[in-house]
C-alpha cells in the first residue's frame, strides 16, 4: 500500500498488483506550485497556484494547509491574489485573461474578462488594480461592479506583482526592462526606481518601508531603498522565485516549484513549505538509468539514491520551452515536445536546444525508435508523425517529417517497439493501437483514458489516469494485468484535472500528461500528478 500524502492526502491509498512493489522516488508535494501570495486577515498566507487551478491558505506557525478554492472550482489558473476589506478574494487568471472574485461565502463571479495574460493585482483604499504580464501591457483600475476599467498606464514591458507604496504611488516590476518602476494611481509617466536587477517579478513593501523584490532569474531576494534604488541581498534561494508576503513583520517568499521560505534575517532562511513538483508530466530514462522529469516550465534529473536536480527551466540558457513529454536519445540528450508546438533536441548540460519540427497543435507524447526516428502525437488533429533519422545525433535542421497516421481519437502517449512498430494511446477511444502499414490495429481496449505508454521486454505498460491505474499487456499473447490501482494520477475517481490555456507568447496550452517510462533494470517510473511526485513500480 502507498498511503495518500501531500496535496493528495485525503485520497485513498494506492495498491500494487500481485507480484509488484510500489514506492515514491520523490516526496509528495504539498502545493501545486506557489505563485502569488498574500496575507489574509486571519494571518495565514494565501497561495495562488496556476498549475493546480487552486488557492490554498498556509498557517505560518504550524505549516497546516487548507484548500480555499479547489481544482474544478470557480477560479482557473490563479497567478496573483488580493483581498478587500469585506474579505472578498480577487484572483488574476493568467491563462483565461480575466479577473475573478470569490466571496467569503464561496460564490464566484468574473470582475473583468478582457485582460490578456492577467497577472499582478492589488487592492488599496477601495481601488482594485490589476495588470498584464506582456510586452506593451496595461495596468488598470477595475470597477468591481462590472463597469469599464480605467487605464492607469499602457505600454509596460511585462508588469508583475505590484503594490502601492507609502507615498501613494504604484510600484511594479517592469520585467522586460529588468527594472522597477512607479507611477501615480491617476496615471502619468512612470519613473525608474531600480535597475540592473535579476529579472524582478514582485515588489512588496516591508512594514519598515523598504521594498522586498524577488528575482525570478537570479533567484535572489533583494532589499531596495525606494528613494535611492540602493539594493542589498536578503537571500539567494534559487531561480524561479515568484512573490512576497509579510506576517507580523516576518518575510515569506514563494517559489514556482511550490516552496514557501521564510527569510529569518539577511542570509538566513528556513522552509515553511518544502519544494516539490507542480505537475509532473512526461518521463524518460537514459541508458545510465537517469530519469528526466518534465514539470512544465522546469525539468529535473532523478538519479537513484539522489534528490531531484534541476536540469533546466524557462529562464535557463537553451531551455526549449514548457516541456510536456520527453524521450532519451543519447548521453545528456533528450527529445522533447513543448506547449508551443515544437519538437526539439535538448542538451541540458551544454545549455542548448535545436528545434526539429514546429508549428503543431498541442503536442503530447514523443518516443525515439531504434533507428533514431522521433515519433510524436498531435492531440488536436488526431495525427502521429515521425522525424526520420534526425533524433539521434542529427544536425541543426528540422529533418524530414512524415505523417504516420490520422483520424486518431485524442492521441497522447506513443512508444516504439524494438522492431520499429509504433504504438499510440487513444485517450478518447480508451485503447492502445499499433500502426501497421498505414492501418491501425487495436492492441489493448477497455481503458478509461490512457495517456503515457511504454514498452519493455515484450510488455506494453499504460498509465490510465481515467482509472487511476497502470495496466500491463503481453504483446505476444494479449494477457493483461493491473500493475497498480488507486494511484494518485489524474483526478479523484478518474476525473480529469483542469486543463489550462496558454500564457501569451511565453507558453501554449498547459495540458496535463501522465508519463510512464521503463528503465534498463525493469523499473517503471510514473508521473503522479495528483500528488506531485514520481513513483517507481518493480516486479518482486
Model-found features: residue ranges?
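Beta-rich, blade/repeat-based domains predominating
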Residues: 27-42, 72-89, 98, 114-131, ...
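Short loop/turn segments immediately following the C-termini of beta-strands
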Residues: 50, 94, 133-134, 175, ...
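Blade-level signature of beta-propeller repeat domains, shared across WD40, Kelch, NHL, RCC1
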Residues: 509-540
Amino acid at each position: 500500500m502507498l498511503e495518500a500524502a501531500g496535496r493528495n492526502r485525503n485520497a485513498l491509498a494506492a495498491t500494487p498488483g500481485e507480484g509488484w512493489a510500489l514506492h515514491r522516488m520523490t516526496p509528495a508535494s504539498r502545493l501545486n506550485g506557489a505563485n502569488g501570495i498574500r496575507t489574509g486577515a486571519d494571518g495565514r498566507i494565501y497561495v495562488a497556484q496556476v498549475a493546480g487551478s487552486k488557492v490554498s491558505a498556509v498557517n505560518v506557525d504550524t505549516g497546516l494547509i487548507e484548500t480555499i478554492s479547489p481544482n474544478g472550482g470557480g477560479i482557473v489558473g490563479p497567478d496573483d491574489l488580493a483581498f478587500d476589506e469585506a474579505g472578498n478574494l480577487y484572483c488574476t487568471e493568467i491563462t483565461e485573461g480575466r479577473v475573478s472574485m470569490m466571496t467569503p461565502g464561496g460564490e464566484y463571479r468574473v470582475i473583468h474578462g478582457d485582460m490578456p495574460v492577467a497577472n499582478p493585482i492589488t487592492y488599496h483604499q477601495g481601488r482594485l488594480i490589476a495588470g498584464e504580464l506582456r510586452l506593451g501591457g496595461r495596468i488598470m483600475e477595475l470597477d468591481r461592479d462590472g463597469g469599464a476599467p480605467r487605464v492607469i498606464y499602457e505600454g509596460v514591458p511585462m508588469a508583475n506583482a505590484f503594490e502601492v507604496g507609502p507615498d501613494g504611488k504604484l510600484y511594479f516590476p517592469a520585467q522586460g526592462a529588468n527594472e522597477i518602476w512607479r507611477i501615480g494611481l491617476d496615471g502619468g509617466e512612470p519613473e525608474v526606481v531600480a535597475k540592473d536587477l535579476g529579472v524582478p517579478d514582485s515588489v512588496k513593501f516591508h512594514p519598515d518601508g523598504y521594498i522586498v523584490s524577488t528575482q525570478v532569474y537570479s533567484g535572489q531576494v533583494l532589499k531596495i531603498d525606494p528613494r535611492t534604488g540602493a539594493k542589498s541581498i536578503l537571500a539567494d534561494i534559487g531561480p524561479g522565485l515568484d512573490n512576497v508576503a509579510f506576517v507580523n513583520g516576518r518575510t515569506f517568499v514563494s517559489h514556482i516549484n511550490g516552496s514557501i521560505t521564510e527569510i529569518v534575517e539577511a542570509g538566513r532562511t528556513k522552509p515553511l513549505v518544502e519544494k516539490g513538483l507542480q505537475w509532473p508530466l512526461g518521463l524518460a530514462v537514459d541508458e545510465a538509468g537517469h530519469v528526466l522529469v518534465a514539470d512544465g516550465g522546469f525539468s529535473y534529473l532523478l538519479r537513484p539514491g539522489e534528490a531531484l536536480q534541476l536540469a533546466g527551466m524557462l529562464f535557463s540558457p537553451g531551455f526549449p520551452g514548457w516541456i510536456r513529454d520527453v524521450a532519451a536519445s543519447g548521453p545528456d540528450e533528450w527529445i522533447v515536445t513543448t506547449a508551443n508546438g515544437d519538437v526539439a533536441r535538448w542538451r541540458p548540460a551544454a545549455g542548448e536546444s535545436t528545434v526539429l519540427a514546429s508549428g503543431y497543435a498541442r503536442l503530447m507524447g514523443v518516443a525515439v525508435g531504434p533507428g533514431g526516428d522521433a515519433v510524436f502525437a498531435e492531440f488536436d488533429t488526431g495525427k502521429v508523425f515521425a522525424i526520420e533519422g534526425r533524433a539521434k545525433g542529427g544536425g541543426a535542421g528540422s529533418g524530414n517529417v512524415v505523417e504516420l497516421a490520422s483520424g486518431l481519437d485524442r492521441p497522447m502517449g506513443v512508444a516504439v517497439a524494438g522492431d520499429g512498430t509504433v504504438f499510440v494511446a487513444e485517450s478518447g477511444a480508451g485503447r492502445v493501437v499499433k500502426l501497421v502499414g498505414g492501418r491501425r490495429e487495436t492492441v489493448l481496449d477497455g481503458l478509461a483514458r490512457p495517456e503515457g505508454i511504454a514498452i519493455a521486454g515484450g510488455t506494453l505498460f499504460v498509465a490510465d489516469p481515467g482509472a487511476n491505474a497502470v495496466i500491463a499487456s503481453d504483446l505476444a499473447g494479449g494477457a493483461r494485468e493491473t500493475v497498480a490501482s488507486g494511484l494518485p494520477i489524474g483526478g479523484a475517481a478518474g476525473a480529469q484535472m483542469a486543463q489550462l490555456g496558454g500564457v501569451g507568447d511565453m507558453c501554449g496550452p498547459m495540458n496535463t500528461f501522465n508519463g510512464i517510462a521503463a528503465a534498463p533494470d525493469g523499473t517503471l517510473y510514473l508521473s503522479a500528478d495528483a500528488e506531485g511526485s514520481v513513483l517507481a513500480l518493480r516486479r518482486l
